[in-house]
Amino acid sequence: MKTHSARKLIPIILLGLFLLIACNFPLKVLWYSPKTAPTLDPAIFGHQGTPAITLQTPGANPLNPVTTLIPFDPNTSVSYIAQSGDTLSVVAAHFDVQPEQITSPQEISSQGILPTGQQLIVPKPAGAASYPVRLLPDSAVINSPCGRDLDIAAAIQGAGGYLNSYTQVVDDETLTGTQVVKRVAENTSTNPRLLLAFIEFRSHWLTQMPESPNLTYPLSLNTPHYEGLYLELSLVAKMLNTGYYAWRQGQIRDLTFSGGGSTGISPDLNAGTAGLLYLFSQLYSQPNFEIALYGENGFMATYRNLFGDPSICDAQIGPLLTSTVQTPVLELPFAAGEVWALTGGLHLDWNTGTPAGALDFAPVTGESRCVVSRAWVLASAAGVVSRVGDGVLQLTLTDENLQPTGWEVLYMHVAGQDRTALGTHVQADERIGHPSCEGGDATGTHVHIARLYKGEWIGAGAPFPLVLSGWTAVPGEKAYQSSLIKGDQVVDSRIDGMYNSQIVR
């Protein structure tokens, strides 16, 4: 059994084409090749009425936490203040040093989340990094409580632009502009304010009525197979998530720009800013990147003009991932005594860009390959059904006082037949629906299970191992290939559900 302390970014490939039982979510095309840098649209960059944004030095950054610092030698070291979600290994990766080279006046956790505000003394990086300003807090990028409070329909209607009357057919269903934004925000767990700001920045559809709207490529991404607002906005979310979670896992230190060229980025950024930088680096050459993101009429100015200062809400809700967050106790999503198979080992929680923290289970019933199974999916913990949709059931976990804990469990490919209704409170092991092929392009009846915490997708392994009924998920060599281990028992994933992939709770 091989394990990995860190994962490389998983190549963006059509894995599902080769699997008997696999997850292909609604965004079917899983590749993206940046094109040459787009020409800056005068209609975008000539837009008036948007206040200028002033570039700040790191010391003046309002997103930097305030703390009392101890002295350090600035000739050899820098002082870094731990942020939401930081671990020692990830901070070391950002600064390109070994974990043992980092010191602190307080004890440093080697595995868990570092306390927010803890001072770390890190060897001084060689040379100055680019783009040191933290632009958006994490809560403004993922679908955190600072995103879920937004009435998307009211925001679009109040802005009075073309998006308010826009409709698009998605998977044989006619969606309004509000429904498109809501679906992308929920599917990818991306903050809807950011999505609306990006739509406005690239098309002005939020506040204006274009004479000849570009219905094929409204966001001007001009990428084959990504036509229409839904797919273009989904692609934006994928690129944003790629940067966000790569930073969260310590897998990115450089930006490579559309059209060529690269630069290192500051090691003390936050994941939200890294995600935004990555997104814009995929769309622009370096000179245009700076204008588009930082310019007087750039994206950040557009965002602030629409929604104000995101750090206000961020301060109200506090850090998202802290050292006090505990992994919830979860059960396997099926009844004791039943035989199911681990058909998909650890793979992407949702789609390209999200971490590898999901598992697939299929009931061993002898039924046809892609039917609504007679077997039942059970709730892995107590909670409230907070979202249902095409194959989707999302459970917001609650404590003994019925208060939300911040944790959520996503079940995908749950059939609409007999599915538990939105708003229903369920107990652990309560029936919530049947596994099926509904939702995306699943190639066999199964259920996909993944976790989120306050809107952030959670991978397996430290600091939040995925444990189901005492079985711990351990990664393998490739996506979908991993094991569940409980004491001396080992269950290996197999796409055909045979041999030692079968598991009894």
PLM feature spans:
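Short alpha-helical segments in extracytoplasmic peptidoglycan/chitin-binding modules
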Residues: 82, 87-105, 117, 185, ...
